[in-house]
């Protein structure tokens, strides 16, 4: 087991090998059982009506695809992300690397398992810094994929005609919400594009599921 300490959470992007590692850890499968409903019936007021519930939503799953593009090229992979109040499990599979990469986390401990072994750190940011030489604000992604800013603040938000988030800027990242889908009684982002310098990451959620928090 390899242990690393917690570094600064936002280091610079350096090479094509770096962005490949991004998907293995950052976006936390393509075998989703059903397609989401088309984004065609959002109304003004829907976002305000659900935002309080979104802010307290801490048990959900997301399955779909993630794509990355830098100056060096582009790739895509399948993603299966399960979030619980105190734990998360993110499985990345497909063309990235050989086989599967599994990221699991709980307070104070994050583990990444892939074909090269098992690696552990106190935070996902520290794990990325150790393995890739840079890191993302991973802890913020839990909020961004729900259409919310991370609670640390400093965000700038633009809304569309229906009052839903259209663009979010935070921690040097720009998150664009391109499409929405219905999950139970909530509207959830279906397609979002995140950019930071030369890095562009696109997440397409083929399936959202709201889970029991037990």
Swiss-Prot record:
GO cellular component: cell outer membrane
One Pfam match: LolB
Membrane-related topology note: Lipid-anchor
Gene Ontology biological process terms, A to Z: lipoprotein localization to outer membrane; protein transport
Keyword Nucleotidyltransferase in record: no
Lipid attachment points (S-diacylglycerol cysteine): 31
HAMAP family (UniProt xref): LolB (MF_00233)
Protein name, UniProt field: Outer-membrane lipoprotein LolB
Gene: lolB
